[in-house]
Regions:
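Non-catalytic cap/lid and distal C-terminal segments of serine-dependent acyl enzymes
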Residues: 19-270
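Sec-dependent N-terminal signal peptides
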Residues: 4-14
Length: 270
């Protein structure tokens, strides 16, 4: 009899465990005239009438919408734990999340900062204001998250970066940046204007809660330290995390937990 009760207890515990729902959806970009996939992770709050905050989670160079959910299994757990929707859009192989001045068909700033949030808000029960939206990402996506949040503070209320390429100029021959911006030698002003480190003038002390994380062995470490120091010099509050680690999924699998906790606190405060 005791064994039976034990089995029933275990079964009831398993059944009662909540599980986030992971869907791959097809969104539409009017500016690029094409469908774009996104992974949407919704917490198990089906019967709840409350609207939910949304975290936009961006992938890096050469990645796609499935990177985060396939390589970091805890991402879905975070949606349940913190009762938030997590959206991982396809930012293409090398969009860098801006509207390219070279190829007008690449409008990923417009897509992620405008078209995608509008689509998500129309299909899910969301808090459809900046106080209910945050954005972060890794590498190219870390650049993209800060870049978009700095420029679109009416859309995103908080932002983060993990191993972000926050200054593009030291890397003129890398990651197809010249295809998106033109060569650095010919168009230095484009590289200046699209580097996160040059957009801090858009911030005030109260504009955006920020969390920036980069490993000390990362090739983006020095540009992240420079951004951190610039934010300190201009009295912009932010969390800056640095620990031993490189530009890899081992580092990001750990970093994402700090990011989600940071945004959960932001959502609760608002």
């Amino acid at each position: 009899m005791k064994k039976l009760f034990a089995i029933l207890f275990v079964l009831s515990s398993v059944i009662s465990v909540k599980a986030a729902k992971v869907d791959t959806v097809s969104t539409y970009s009017a500016s690029m005239k094409k469908n774009i996939k996104a992974v949407v992770i919704t917490p198990d709050v089906v019967n709840s009438p409350e609207k939910l905050p949304v975290l936009y989670l961006l992938h890096g160079y050469s990645g796609n919408q499935s990177d985060w959910i396939s390589k970091v299994k805890t991402v879905a757990d975070y949606a349940d734990q913190y009762k938030m929707i997590i959206v991982c859009p396809d930012g293409n192989f090398s969009s860098w999340y801006f509207d390219s001045p070279v190829d007008k068909s690449w409008k990923y700033e417009t897509y992620v900062s405008n078209e995608l949030p509008a689509w998500i808000d129309s299909h899910y029960k969301t808090i459809n204001t900046a106080s209910g939206r945050a954005i972060t990402g890794l590498s190219m996506g870390g650049h993209g998250a800060l870049y978009l949040a700095f420029k679109h503070q009416d859309i995103f209320g908080a932002a983060g970066s993990m191993s972000g390429g926050v200054d593009l100029r030291p890397f003129p021959l890398n990651w197809e940046l010249s295809k998106r911006l033109g060569s650095y030698a010919e168009f230095p002003e484009r590289w200046d204007n699209n580097s996160v480190i040059n957009l801090t003038h858009l911030l005030t002390a109260k504009s955006l809660p920020l969390i920036i994380d980069c490993g000390s062995e990362d090739f983006f470490y020095q540009v992240n330290v420079k951004l951190h120091n610039k934010l300190l010099e201009t009295n912009i509050p932010h969390d800056f995390i640095s620990r031993k680690g490189a530009h890899n999924w081992e580092y990001w699998s750990n970093a994402i937990g700090y990011q989600v906790l940071f945004f959960s606190r932001f959502f609760k405060a608002n």
